Amino acid sequence: MSGTPEVISLGCRLNIAESERMRAMMAGERDLVVVNSCAVTREAVRQTRQAIRRARRANPSARLLVTGCAAETEREAIAAMPEVDGLVANAAKLDPRAWNLPETAPPAPKQRTRAFVAIQNGCDHACTFCIIPQGRGPSHSLPIKDVLREVESHLEQGAPEIV
């Protein structure tokens, strides 16, 4: 494996954006595979398990960690998989301390067409049909200074569009 960790992203655009940030944060880490999971449907959970097994076969000696919504909603089942070396809480996945990394801010990942800035995450509603609150937790917003810092970083990297 190279010095760039493999981050496998399943699910929504927010997961894709978070995966890019994790990849930038973990630059230089070797022999690491992260599965950023989804749990929005039963099929998404099945695909998460499949991605975990596939990642282990492709990287038998790498440390394989799982984060994301399925790592929250299916915590016991995912942790019991023999392929999995550990779980990182969804709420902590962008915190370098959760990965035993230095707390310096990572550079914004380079984007080809658009950069993503998540300003709100989670949900305070308890709709019977939705698993988002269990996977992402209660609603919380990024402080405006952090939003501006992230936008500035993307602009410095040459992002032509910010979503």
Role assignments for model-derived ranges:
Residues 1-163:
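Proteins enriched for Cys/Gly/acidic motifs involved in redox and nucleic-acid/cofactor modification
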